[in-house]
Amino acid sequence: MRVPIENRIGKEGEGFGLAQTWINAGRIRHGARSLGVMERCLELAIGYAKQRKTFGVPLAQRQSIQWPIVDMQMDAHKLRLMLHHVAWKFDRGEDCRQEAFMVKIFGDERSFWTADRCMQIHGGMGLSKELPIERFFRDQRSMMITEGAIEVLRMALARMILDVK
């Protein structure tokens, strides 16, 4: 298809570079969305763990509940810091492909894991449509495919890091 010159975005031959910039922005947004899911899952898991009792003891006092919540909190903090860094580089117009890949891979994988753990903490209620957890679980699984499948991004990131073809 021929595009009239007045409708061209950028200069001739620079389309791929522009597309990479837009794709990087999408991967950064993936990370931000993943962080939002992680934070909401944490709120739900913490609230439920404090309220729900089994055998007279709140779930929050059980190590099998505490440790995943700690890991969820640490992962959210890591992703938040990664997002600040990649957004800073992106805003400055610096090359941030590696960081954008890492944010997408880490964010998608860990937000899916967080939704899974939140679902597990809630037991059967985590599967119900009354709570947003089952939707987070499904949505975050699909995020690992869109804007670049995480396996492909991991392979491309390895090539960048190792400087191999």
Tell what function each PLM region has.
Residues 1-3:
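Short Ser/Thr-interspersed hydrophobic loop/turn segments at strand-loop and sheet-helix junctions
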Residues 5, 12-165:
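Alpha-helical interface subdomain recognition
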